[in-house]
């Protein structure tokens, strides 16, 4: 296995779509959330990372889709902060409700399309 590729948790859930959260240090520190969908990774840059309370929203800037090899990619400026699988609960043009099942458990989020950007919200109702 090349030195910049790691095994992902999602491999133990082969029928579930994977996600990865990258800790990206350049051009300025931010996180990238990538959700497997339709053979690509839909991606959002998170300048302040994942929300930690349901009372806050975090800006999520949609960026171009990435190839599936980014599930395991890291380099000197990008590390894998978390990985696992995700499940969608509801979707409309303006909102995606989903749960990330990562290394520290399951957390439910909503991605809300504001028209110009997205907001990432940690929901009050969390997965059991």
Predicted region positions:
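A charge-rich, low-complexity, intrinsically flexible signal that marks solvent-exposed coils, linkers
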Residues: 1-128
């Amino acid at each position: 296995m090349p030195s910049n590729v790691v095994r992902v948790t999602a491999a133990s859930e082969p029928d579930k779509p994977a996600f990865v959260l990258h800790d990206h240090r350049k051009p300025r520190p931010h996180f990238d959330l990538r959700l497997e969908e339709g053979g690509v990774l839909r991606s959002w840059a998170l300048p302040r990372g994942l929300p930690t309370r349901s009372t806050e929203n975090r800006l999520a800037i949609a960026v171009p889709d990435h190839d599936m090899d980014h599930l395991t990619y890291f380099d000197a400026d990008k590390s894998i902060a978390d990985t696992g699988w995700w499940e969608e609960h509801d979707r409309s043009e303006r909102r995606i409700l989903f749960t990330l099942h990562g290394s520290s458990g399951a957390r439910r989020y909503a991605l809300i399309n504001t028209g110009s950007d997205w907001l990432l919200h940690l929901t009050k109702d969390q997965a059991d």
